[in-house]
Curated annotation (Swiss-Prot):
Alphabetical UniProt keywords: Ribonucleoprotein, Ribosomal protein
Bias type Basic and acidic residues, positions: 25-34
SUPFAM superfamilies registered for this protein in UniProt: Zn-binding ribosomal proteins
Name of the gene encoding the protein in the UniProt record: rpmG
Originating organism: Lysinibacillus sphaericus (strain C3-41)
Record-stated family: Belongs to the bacterial ribosomal protein bL33 family.
Lineage start: Bacteria, Bacillati, Bacillota, Bacilli, Bacillales
Stored NCBIfam families: PRK00504.1 (NF001764), PRK00595.1 (NF001860), rpmG_bact (TIGR01023)
Gene3D superfamilies: Ribosomal protein L33 (2.20.28.120)
Biological processes, Gene Ontology terms: translation
Protein name in UniProt: Large ribosomal subunit protein bL33
InterPro entries per UniProt: Ribosomal_bL33 (IPR001705), Ribosomal_bL33_CS (IPR018264), Ribosomal_bL33_sf (IPR038584), Ribosomal_zn-bd (IPR011332)
Keyword Ribosomal protein: yes
Any one cellular-component term (Gene Ontology): ribonucleoprotein complex
GO molecular function, one term: structural constituent of ribosome
Length: 49
């Protein structure tokens, strides 16, 4: 079952990205390095509720 999630920057708190994930394969929170437009560099983004 795929669900839609939001990824928020850990440094600014901005919610920059929306993606989907499979809860059965990835039950824990997703963490990805993505580009932050405000900081103009890549930062760690975590899944938010």
């Amino acid at each position: 079952m795929r669900v839609q999630i939001t990824l928020a920057c850990t440094e600014t708190g901005d919610k920059n990205y929306i993606t989907t994930k499979n809860k059965r394969n990835n039950p824990e929170r997703l963490e990805l390095k993505k580009y932050s437009p405000r900081l103009k560099r890549t930062t760690l983004h975590r899944e938010t509720k």
